[in-house]
Amino acid sequence: MVLDGVLPVTASQEEVTFGQAVSFEASVKHFAADCVDSGECPFVGSAREVEQALRSFLAGLDDSPLPTASDRELTESLGQYAVLSFLYFPSSDYPRLRAALTEAVEEDDGTALLSLVDERVNRSPDGRYLDNSTEAFYAVTCADMPYNGTVDEVARLASQWQEVAPTFGEAFAWGMLSCVGWPQAAES
């Protein structure tokens, strides 16, 4: 038996999600340092400057999504997901993430970053999802750690978390609203 991500059973979704946001912020710092050291970073400057440039790039996608080779644009949320999902395995994922970011930053083309997202969510080129792992993740998370916060409560948390985890804190806080209303009682 393999236990992955064992958490205290008393941990709330808010506690777990905040912990993830802080941990991913540490991963962003690691990626930024690696990006500078690689000599193949699409952003210039120190690791701290690369972190800020990455955040600015992602935030800019909200107002100016990047075109891709498909009919889909690379939006801020898709850009964040691409970066987030490629922070797990530095030796194998960082080079691919750097290359995709380079294409986006230097060529204004979001195709490679969108491809990274599709890979992680098992979306085929024709738009079909090859499994329901994303839905299963939410179902299990929401059943294990229900969350019934309000939009106002999450807005307050998003603002606070943004201070501690400026790359993903706000998005992680808002993501908890996905669990409002879970678990849903079965109809008899």
Each predicted region: which residue ranges?
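A catalytic-pocket lid/entrance helix-loop region that shapes and gates access to the active site
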Residues: 2-53, 99-115, 119-125
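Alpha/beta-hydrolase fold active-site neighborhood
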Residues: 51-187
